[in-house]
């Protein structure tokens, strides 16, 4: 049984004070970690406040990015080794905003995945197609290629433990949501790609999230789908009430 995982991705929002207030507002109302894993991915500047205030609760903490080296002359980068030392659980990599604005390549994302595992953290690897690619009928091929490149040379055991987030670029922050059927269709492609690269056992264990205008109004329908194990949620994760509705979608 795959444990559902709902992760809020704050992007470049919230300061440490707001972070502390947010955690205090949600931490006593989270589902048991065995029921639904509740995660917040926060900017690096907010991680200390997030970790400090989440202590003793079921809230898991994710960084929104890291570098593929542990230390050195890499001005402005975040060390995966230090993230682990701080107590971070997950690292989001390959988000379409990182690929688009900061020119991250599939190779960069694969190197980061290896660095994250090397340091005992778990990656949440994002993939997804543009509207242009979808309209050209190439969404499935595009996503399969992204997943294949991201997982290069990872062990079966590593892949079984990671999270892959399918985020159609055309549905991020646009108010357009892929229908639950569209989301399920590509999440199934993600799982099939893992099965083709590894085997059915690994594919059955990997958790696949859908991201792209996920909100309390549509989370239940999405989570009912066979191949959708969670959500990577942007805007709706910035408000304690809506975040709690998302992570407690079973109730």
UniProtKB/Swiss-Prot annotation:
Subcellular locations according to the entry: Cytoplasm
CC annotations in GO: cytosol
InterPro entries, per database record: Aldolase_TIM (IPR013785), TIM_sf (IPR035990), TrioseP_Isoase_bac/euk (IPR022896), Triosephosphate_isomerase (IPR000652), Triosephosphate_isomerase_AS (IPR020861)
A single GO molecular function term of this UniProt record: triose-phosphate isomerase activity
Keyword set, alphabetical order: Cytoplasm, Gluconeogenesis, Glycolysis, Isomerase
Pfam family of the protein (one): TIM
SUPFAM superfamilies in the cross-refs: Triosephosphate isomerase (TIM) (SSF51351)
Record GO biological process: gluconeogenesis; glyceraldehyde-3-phosphate biosynthetic process; glycerol catabolic process; glycolytic process
Catalytic site positions: 95 (electrophile), 167 (proton acceptor)
PROSITE patterns: TIM_1, TIM_2
CDD domains given in the database record: TIM
Catalytic activity: D-glyceraldehyde 3-phosphate = dihydroxyacetone phosphate
Top EC class of this enzyme: isomerase
Residues involved in substrate binding: 9-11, 173, 213, 234-235
Subcellular location, principal: cytoplasm
Pathway assignment: Carbohydrate biosynthesis; gluconeogenesis; Carbohydrate degradation; glycolysis; D-glyceraldehyde 3-phosphate from glycerone phosphate: step 1/1
E.C. number: 5.3.1.1
Stated family: Belongs to the triosephosphate isomerase family.
Function text: Involved in the gluconeogenesis. Catalyzes stereospecifically the conversion of dihydroxyacetone phosphate (DHAP) to D-glyceraldehyde-3-phosphate (G3P).
Subunit structure: Homodimer.
Protein's name according to its UniProt entry: Triosephosphate isomerase
Species this protein is from: Ligilactobacillus salivarius (strain UCC118) (Lactobacillus salivarius)
